[in-house]
Design a protein with these regions (language model features):
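Interfacial transmembrane-helix boundary/kink motif in multi-pass membrane proteins
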Residues: 1-18, 58-89, 144, 150
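Juxtamembrane helix-loop-helix connectors linking adjacent transmembrane helices
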Residues: 61-127
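Alpha-helical transmembrane segments in multi-pass membrane proteins
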Residues: 6-59
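Residue-level signature of transmembrane alpha-helical entry/exit and packing/kink sites
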Residues: 5-13, 37-42, 69-77, 115-120, ...
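Alpha-helical transmembrane segments and their membrane-interface exit regions
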Residues: 45-53, 103, 177-186
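Membrane interface segments of multi-pass transport proteins and intramembrane proteases
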Residues: 31-36, 95-103, 142-149
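Transmembrane helix-loop-helix hairpins at the membrane interface
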Residues: 116-194
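Aromatic-anchored segments of alpha-helical transmembrane domains
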Residues: 17-26, 81-89, 156-164
């Protein structure tokens, strides 16, 4: 591998890390109750989401909504979520055998007592957009070759790690979700399917 290629891959890795840090920055303020502060925080989260989408589009990692216009696309999305459901059920069974009732990640979210609108913005909009850009788009698509098994495994393990697993069952859930999403990205190279 050439020095230029190694440097470029390292810079993509740093970009992925920076984006994750930017995504996490607003979580410092999730306990705010003032309506104006909540509104501002939601706006910041939406801007981070829009920035991630813009960056993904500019880097050629996203094609846009036209990708979702086919029946095949929706079939793949359905199969992806079926895979996530299966992995989650397996992980939940292992958690039950371990005597673990909740993941650390879930406990943090529940104990934060977030405003419901903040919670929805963070967990339904910002986190999925940013995490797909980082773990599938940048790590699998740019740091590694999208077809790389090493990239698939490493991005899956890192995806599991950032969700703070506290048991084998939780590892199965989050790393399994990362592996499912990564497998779909590896096969079709479309973040929109993830």
């Amino acid at each position: 591998m050439k020095k230029e290629s190694i440097l470029k891959r390292f810079l993509y890795f740093l970009l992925a890390f920076l984006i994750l840090c930017i995504e996490q920055a607003p979580t410092i303020f999730v306990r705010v109750k003032d309506v104006r502060a909540v509104s501002l925080l939601i706006l910041v989260m939406l801007l981070i989401s829009a920035g991630a989408l813009f960056l993904g589009k500019r880097m050629g990692l996203l094609e846009g909504f036209k990708t979702l216009s086919s029946l095949k696309a929706w079939g793949m999305i359905g199969l992806t979520y079926l895979g996530i459901y299966i992995v989650t059920r397996i992980g939940a069974m292992v958690m039950m055998w371990e005597g673990v009732s909740n993941s650390t990640n879930q406990e943090i979210i529940e104990n934060a007592h977030m405003n419901p609108f903040l919670l929805i913005t963070f967990t339904v909009i910002m986190a999925p957009i940013v995490e797909e850009l980082v773990f599938r788009g940048l790590l699998m698509g740019r740091v590694f070759n999208p077809d790389s098994i090493v990239g698939l495994i490493l991005s899956s393990l890192l995806f599991g790690l950032v969700h703070m697993p506290n048991s084998i069952g939780v590892w199965i859930i989050y790393a399994g979700m990362g592996f499912t999403l990564g497998t779909v990205y590896r096969k079709f190279q479309k973040l929109e399917y993830c």
